[in-house]
Amino acid sequence: TLRVAEKVKSINPNIKTIHYVAPQVWVWREGRVKKFKKFLDHILLLFDFEKKYFDKENIPNTFVGHPLLEQESKDKIDLSNIISNDKKIISLFSGSRSSEVNLLLPILINFINMMNTKFDNFSFVFHATDENKNLISEKINNTNVKNVEVISDENIKKQILNKSTFAVSKSGTVSLEICNAKVPSIIIYKMNFLNFLIVKMLVKIKFANIINIINNKEIIPELIQKECNPKEIYNSVVYFLKNPELM
């Protein structure tokens, strides 16, 4: 959409352009925001902390909030036919893109197997999208992993998250929803090594998770790249489960 706005502005400079969801200038190194000023007349911001970046360049902006934090639950659904009432829930978010699922799902499946070896009172729920539910289900069905459900219904996912004891999530704005539900969590992410090196050269932030970025410190633990492995995830989750006062 930024390219469209730039093209429209080049054709007719008098057309006013309003962009919903600010370009993440706080992620990338300096310089990009000056370019946006040339073809964006107003920006609608999801996060209040973004204002300072656009105010600095005198780009008109308005903070409108994030829709994930404003969604209301619909009618309550009986989850007993999905999750056993005597099981604690750990919600898992392996990403929306197939490339993310392909990379993170095997790691999470191995983590679940490790948990099942030591504990018998947990159910693991993958929060899928309509687009990737089949991909996740097929990969899980090709393993011997137990105590796993894959859910794509938005209302059911929200209620399951609200009942969760813990969450393991790919970095992204879903961490806001997890935080809003007051569910303790850790953030994981992994990409191929070449892409990781490229990103390291381009980005200027220290954290992968939006909550940590906003606060400029690690509030939610992050397991990135080589630390994103079944053993580290298992150790982190078990540590917090055994020390609930830290959650």
Could you tell me what each predicted segment is?
Residues 1-247:
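Nucleotide-activated sugar donor-binding and catalytic core shared by glycosyltransferases
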